[in-house]
């Protein structure tokens, strides 16, 4: 499948004008083109950079990969330790019991004993939704939290023992497990997701719903063991009325009932569908032939599903919340939305990355010939869509900026001038409820501002998809390089002297796609946060707090570029910038540190490798003059490694900056 020559065909030339380059890659190591310098790498820091770059780069046939794959129980063990620690700290160092008595108080963690006759020293505000989750589970005491923490440690120990057994003792079982990915996928669907959903539905019906009904009615909660029978549940429902869960006061929500129904139906679909239905590999030729033979393709599909589910949950966390008291805890709503949007974005990009690796290493181009022959049409249409959306979506803002500069507000796109309401705006209602001093918001009234920024969402998302789809479809071959099998997933930029291989590897497409994913998710969470907190402010400014009579800051000022810069970024950052010396100081310090990490990334992204190599050579010259010669010669990072370091700092710094900015603002204004 691999040729020792690349035929580079000019698209507008005849066959006699074909240019052939004889390029010998026989010395290149499989998995990375950095193997060309393998001889010198052992005496230079290049070996260190390669160690980082190749840490997860192993093929299906290696024994190491079988060990790692068999040790997946160790990963589950780490998750159990995390869960155990969460419940342990909730039992000993949180105000969960106080929050149960009065959910209007702020959930906090790490409450320590008095020091030098002082009160609790700035407990950490919990915005992860754990308190709401525990109440939805039916946990009403710290004893139950301690039991769960102990169970988590026991489960983690069992997982670690099972992982050790799979890695070192049961080699035959490991071999069978790793060579039958299709059966493993069925095991995941039936055993983990199917039976897990069924067990969770049973817990919601027998424990969570009765406990929440009793709490809402002010009745003492019995032992959970007494609620396991259907008779006990029926008695509670008959005596206390099931309508207690249908109230919309922000405390106990009917969606908890729908969650039980949803998980029961999902369990049936997964268990039956994975064995007999369309989810089984027996009735799915694509799964059995292609996806089932490649770990990377299986992982890519799973990342797609998980990432999509995370994004959907982010939308549901505010539009249709399941957990009790969530709607009146505004910092938690914001945190859940932002967190799951980021997770979904990273998972979806990771799906394209692993699909590209699988296409390069584990499949033949003929397997995807139907798709690959249409890739130019696919990319051509995507390019047209991106260009159309970009010009028209930004054109709306350019028009408004121009009209505002000319002093013609009546000619701007706005609710008060040229209205551009979404087609289905009437279907999305806004429900406001005042619960004590807190205000709960369910749903959002759509306006011209939403119409404009939603088209920006469409543009950024389609651009991200264009980059990632191009990287996937051209991962194995392209017009420039007709077979990338030995070049693999990532290879260096060789410049125009080698035909111009800059930015054509699948890794480079993932690199660029992550930046656009960052842009896409940033605009989404900016839109959500600004509209959410400005709606809260306008509700409080209204008479009685029951009907929103004032237009929000988002509706009035997000229709032009200056509004985003002035009203959202500059004005909204006042709390985090002025937080020093206040209980919000941690957010201010995080804001500063994250800005530094983000700025550090630019040093790697804006400079070339030659600059750093020449700087290193100058430092080495000085060392030689002083007869202090390092045994291992320093080498600059490769282009790919430098981009990876820059990308990592860019994403982490940007996310930390946004997170601290959001939380400081929402805690100070609506917390």
Curated annotation (Swiss-Prot):
Provide this UniProt record's keywords sorted from A to Z. Answer: 4Fe-4S, Chlorophyll, Chloroplast, Chromophore, Electron transport, Iron, Iron-sulfur, Magnesium, Membrane, Metal-binding, Oxidoreductase, Photosynthesis, Photosystem I, Plastid, Thylakoid, Transmembrane, Transmembrane helix, Transport
Q: Where does [4Fe-4S] cluster bind?
A: 493, 502
Q: Does the keyword Phosphoprotein apply?
A: no
Gene Ontology cellular component annotations, sorted alphabetically: chloroplast thylakoid membrane; photosystem I
Q: Does the keyword Chloroplast apply?
A: yes
Query: What does it catalyze?
Result: reduced [plastocyanin] + hnu + oxidized [2Fe-2S]-[ferredoxin] = oxidized [plastocyanin] + reduced [2Fe-2S]-[ferredoxin]
| Cofactor detail note | P700 is a chlorophyll a/chlorophyll a' dimer, A0 is one or more chlorophyll a, A1 is one or both phylloquinones and FX is a shared 4Fe-4S iron-sulfur center.
The residues the record assigns to binding chlorophyll a' are: 595
> Transmembrane stretches, by residue range?
68-91, 145-168, 185-209, 259-277, 295-318, 334-360, 377-399, 451-469, 509-530, 584-606, 644-664
One function term, GO molecular function aspect: chlorophyll binding
Record-linked InterPro entries: PSI_PsaA/B, PSI_PsaA/B_CS, PSI_PsaA/B_sf
Per UniProt, subcellular location reads as: Plastid, Chloroplast thylakoid membrane
- What's the Enzyme Commission number for this chain? 1.97.1.12
Membrane topology, as annotated: Multi-pass membrane protein
Biological-process GO terms, alphabetical: photosynthesis
Residues where phylloquinone binds: 612
**So where does chlorophyll a get bound?**
603, 611
Top-rank taxon, per record: Eukaryota
Query: Its quaternary structure?
Result: The PsaA/B heterodimer binds the P700 chlorophyll special pair and subsequent electron acceptors. PSI consists of a core antenna complex that captures photons, and an electron transfer chain that converts photonic excitation into a charge separation. The eukaryotic PSI reaction center is composed of at least 11 subunits.
Q: What function does this protein fulfil?
A: PsaA and PsaB bind P700, the primary electron donor of photosystem I (PSI), as well as the electron acceptors A0, A1 and FX. PSI is a plastocyanin/cytochrome c6-ferredoxin oxidoreductase, converting photonic excitation into a charge separation, which transfers an electron from the donor P700 chlorophyll pair to the spectroscopically characterized acceptors A0, A1, FX, FA and FB in turn. Oxidized P700 is reduced on the lumenal side of the thylakoid membrane by plastocyanin or cytochrome c6.
State the family it belongs to: Belongs to the PsaA/PsaB family.
PANTHER family, A to Z: OUTER MEMBRANE PROTEIN, OMPA-RELATED (PTHR30128), PHOTOSYSTEM I P700 CHLOROPHYLL A APOPROTEIN A1-RELATED (PTHR30128:SF19)
Q: What is this protein called?
A: Photosystem I P700 chlorophyll a apoprotein A1
Protein species of origin: Amphidinium operculatum
